């Protein structure tokens, strides 16, 4: 249709008596977004008609060429012009900046005989749009210094540069300039300010600017919705969306994409379905690929994999974004085979796709598959990201594969990670390295990584404190906790679990009591069930059984099987059969089918020689239909897995194993003679055998 309109205007070029009709034709090319071929057609006619030396038509030709995709032709017109005016220079500079030829634009800018407001705005806007935001700010500062009037285009462009740099200090300075200008009430400037504060993570100021706006358009609402969706709380994004609808502002695809993303992060499936219904009724948006991708992602994250697959299959064009969302969705649904099939069928993969499947395997405990896929990623010359390494280190940690973890560490170093925040935030790669080393028992290596990190967050401190605690370095854990407080890092509930666990393993009862009682007062961390479990374990290990029992009974939440089990184990260690029987009954109320309480209680009676009570416990087990599953252990030696069951006598080295068992039992209980050792219950013998087999192979 646009081509026909152009041809109609160009029907009789030879009859044109001045250059104005040619200018109209060139405007038609620009407005209709025609290719440069049509501009060349007009250009040839201009030359034939004898108007090619008019500066007016030459300027229009430069403008048309640059806007229709052939800046080279426009530059040739510019270079051949005997005379140029400010419009001529601006047309070329604007064309260069819009197409990203920024260095060439800068060179031309510096050679201009004069500049005006339009010239400066083109430079600020062009550099901001192409992510050279520092230079955009410099041009803006020079423009202001040289006394040029700043208008709405100047402010919008420089705010975009501040957003690109996440530089709120500069943004605030620009905001104060705007406050002194006539543009504070401009709806586009208001929207740009909301967006700037949003991108800088300042939700409060974004909301304040929005609230102060006299007029708002769809861009204003989108900026605030996106602010909450990206910075949180995401539920506020849904509230703002509801206010937008009540204000009768029609949402566009940007609005809906942000709302769908908020629904995904909140698992707000009902609101997401309502938005989906709105889109289905809108012919214009129904097949929008961005919205389709967002819906696939939302349904996948909400564990509605069937709905996600339905939308995916309905998409006229599928891209890597939708396919990656499906991979993540299948992984969340524990369908790693379906995720791998989707991955295999992808025509095009990016590193995000690889990361999604690697993460899926680690989330589902298929760590060997994750490691294998990472090796394939390397063979196919895909450059891993910080997220790739974080997942692969998690797999190594879960498998306790120190050798592979160290290889992954070498790859991390080769990729130049510095463990600091920024555009590529890789602090959590350092955190993953710490976690891997401490879980593999290499606390010193984990601590070395911790000390070499250029920046640390709360997770870094937590990983190291818990690593110390779990590996028996109680003093070091508490010392590091004190250092954490001195650094100004605020502890969270995970930190306090590590601290209390360290006290428990080291037997620091008074310190544990102190830190538990000061959690809320000093750090604003209300004790959770896990903190009570740590305290019960601490008190139980130290023999303060009644205090541990009182703590459980005074908990503000219902005790679970873990906390009762911890106290029951302590009762066995300290041979408190009366309390042990009470705790076992409480534990069975929580988990009636758990064989653990029966076995521990039976062993306690056996240790005291109360064989009739042992038989009664066993009868109760049979009566309740509770059976004890045989234990299974394994160990990797020189790359080979050795697996064995309780009472398993099939191992080729069983004689050496049982000989060592006798020696170890004698060492473990030197104060008892062999007649006492012979009275060990079968469960205790099984348990000791397991320990021995681990050490003998």
Curated annotation (Swiss-Prot):
Q: Where is this region: Type E(+) motif?
A: 639-669
- For region Type E motif, the annotated ranges are 563-638
Instruction: Tell me the superkingdom of the source.
Output: Eukaryota
Q: Which UniProt keywords apply?
A: Repeat
One of the entry's Gene Ontology molecular-function terms is: RNA binding
Q: Which InterPro entries match?
A: E_motif, Pentatricopeptide_rpt, PPR_At4g14850-like_plant, TPR-like_helical_dom_sf
Q: What are the start and end residues of each PPR repeat? A: 18-53, 54-84, 85-115, 116-150, 151-185, 186-216, 217-251, 252-282, 288-322, 324-349, 350-384, 385-419, 426-456, 457-491, 492-527, 528-558
Gene Ontology cellular-component annotations: mitochondrion
The Gene Ontology biological process annotation of the record reads: mitochondrial mRNA modification; sugar mediated signaling pathway
> According to its UniProt record, which protein family does this protein belong to?
Belongs to the PPR family. PCMP-E subfamily.
What is this protein's name? Pentatricopeptide repeat-containing protein At2g13600
Natural source organism: Arabidopsis thaliana
Q: Gene encoding this chain?
A: PCMP-E76
């Amino acid at each position: 249709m646009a081509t026909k309109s152009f041809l109609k205007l160009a029907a009789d070029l030879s009859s044109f008596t001045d250059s104005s009709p040619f200018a109209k034709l060139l405007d038609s090319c620009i407005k209709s977004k025609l290719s440069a071929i049509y501009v060349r057609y007009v250009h040839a006619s201009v030359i034939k008609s004898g108007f090619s030396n008019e500066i007016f038509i030459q300027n229009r030709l430069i403008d048309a060429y640059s806007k229709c995709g052939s800046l080279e032709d426009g530059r040739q017109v510019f270079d051949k012009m005997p005379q140029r005016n400010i419009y001529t220079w601006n047309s070329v500079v604007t064309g260069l900046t819009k197409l990203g030829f920024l260095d060439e634009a800068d060179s031309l800018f510096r050679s201009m005989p004069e500049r005006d407001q339009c010239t400066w705005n083109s430079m600020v806007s062009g550099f901001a749009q192409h992510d050279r935001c520092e230079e955009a700010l410099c041009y803006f500062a020079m423009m202001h210094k040289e006394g040029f009037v700043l208008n709405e285009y100047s402010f919008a462009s420089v705010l975009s540069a501040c957003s690109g740099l996440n530089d709120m200090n500069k943004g605030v300075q620009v905001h104060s300039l705007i406050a002194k200008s006539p543009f504070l009430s401009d709806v586009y400037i208001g929207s740009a300010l909301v967006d700037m504060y949003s991108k800088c993570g300042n939700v409060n100021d974004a909301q304040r600017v929005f609230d102060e706006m006299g007029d708002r358009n769809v861009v204003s609402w989108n900026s605030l919705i996106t602010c909450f969706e990206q910075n949180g709380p995401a539920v506020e994004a849904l509230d703002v969306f509801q206010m937008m609808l009540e204000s009768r502002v029609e949402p566009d695809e940007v609005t809906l994409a942000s709302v769908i993303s908020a629904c995904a992060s909140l698992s707000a499936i009902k609101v997401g379905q309502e938005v989906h219904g709105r889109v289905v009724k809108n012919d214009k948006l129904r097949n929008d690929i961005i919205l389709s991708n967002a819906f696939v992602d939302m349904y996948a994250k909400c564990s509605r994999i069937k709905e996600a697959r339905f939308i995916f299959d309905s998409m006229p064009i599928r891209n890597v974004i939708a396919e990656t969302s499906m991979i993540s969705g299948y992984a969340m649904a524990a369908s790693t085979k379906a995720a791998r099939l989707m991955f295999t069928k992808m025509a095009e993969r990016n590193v995000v796709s690889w990361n999604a499947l690697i993460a899926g395997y680690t989330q589902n405990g298929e760590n060997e598959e994750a490691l294998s896929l990472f090796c394939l990623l390397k063979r196919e010359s895909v450059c891993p990201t910080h997220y790739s390494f974080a997942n692969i280190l998690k797999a190594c940690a879960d498998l306790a594969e120190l050798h592979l973890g160290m290889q992954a560490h070498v790859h991390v170093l080769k990729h130049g990670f510095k463990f600091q925040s920024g555009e590529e935030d890789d602090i959590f790669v350092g955190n993953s390295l710490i976690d891997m080393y401490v879980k593999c028992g290499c606390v010193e290596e984990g601590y070395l990584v911790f000390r070499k990190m250029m920046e640390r967050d709360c997770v870094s401190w937590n990983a190291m404190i818990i690593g110390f605690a779990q590996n028996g370095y109680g003093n070091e854990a508490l010392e590091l906790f004190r250092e954490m407080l001195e650094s100004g890092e605020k502890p969270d509930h995970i930190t306090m679990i590590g601290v209390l666990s360290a006290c428990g393993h080291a037997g620091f009862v008074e310190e544990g009591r102190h830190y538990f009682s000061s959690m809320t007062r000093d750090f604003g961390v209300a004790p959770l069930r896990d903190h009570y479990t740590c305290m019960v374990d601490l008190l139980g290990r130290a023999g303060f059984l009644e205090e541990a029992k009182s703590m459980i009974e005074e908990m503000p939440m219902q005790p679970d099987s873990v906390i009762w089990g911890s106290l029951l184990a302590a009762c066995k260690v300290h041979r408190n059969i009366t309390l042990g029987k009470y705790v076992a009954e409480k534990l069975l109320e929580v988990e009636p089918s758990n064989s653990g309480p029966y076995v521990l209680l039976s062993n306690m009676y056996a240790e005291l020689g109360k064989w009739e009570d042992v038989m009664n416990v066993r009868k109760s087990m049979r009566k309740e239909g509770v059976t004890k599953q045989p234990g299974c252990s394994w160990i990797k030696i020189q790359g080979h897995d050795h697996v064995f069951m309780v009472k398993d006598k099939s191992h080729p080295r069983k004689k050496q194993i049982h000989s060592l068992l006798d020696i170890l039992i004698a060492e473990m209980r030197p104060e008892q003679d062999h007649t006492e050792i012979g009275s060990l219950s079968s469960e205790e013998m099984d348990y000791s055998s397991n320990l021995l087999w681990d050490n003998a192979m």
